[in-house]
Amino acid sequence: MEAFESFVAVALEAEGLVVSSGVKFPVRLQTRRVDRVEIQTHGYEVDLVGARADRLILATVKSALGSRGVVAEHVTGETTNESARKRYTLLNHPEIRRKVISEAGRRYGYRASQIELRLYVGRFAGPVEGVHEKKIRAWARTKRVGGGPIRVFGLGDVVGSVREAASHKQYRDNQVLVTIKVLEAAGMLTQPLPDNSA
């Protein structure tokens, strides 16, 4: 599990979900061959899978911290940069999206209406103007996947959930939560943790 994925996993656990990382779903697709029909199976990886009795979350996680950030055209697939578009295939390729949702439901025993597709972003491109974030969120709201639209979560959403989880007094041996507690104890956090004595 990558570092930012660890933060997202804590946020998902805070929703009462059991979280697993790096799950591949096989998808059969017709190749582009013109001389004959050829079907190939490829595994499409979902970064994090969160599950509880009534819901299954398939999460694509892109930190993009230390880089330009997540670009709207790459997520939506409206780019000539094939490599960048492929990083978001699960989101921007309707047939693959549909087949992954179907396979996840079959594998784990969920109806499509119980499955949610999410995008977690550490840094959106152009954060000052917020243009890319707005475009991505607007695009995602129009995509019906499983039980609803693709949901988009930014760094603030993730950190808010993680800080809330870290505020509880019960100790959990989790690197992310302990890091937050250490930084607070050292006076390095600019905002104090919420007071949750429970």
PLM segments and residue spans:
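Intrinsically disordered, low-complexity Ser/Thr/Pro/Gly-rich regulatory segments
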Residues: 1-198
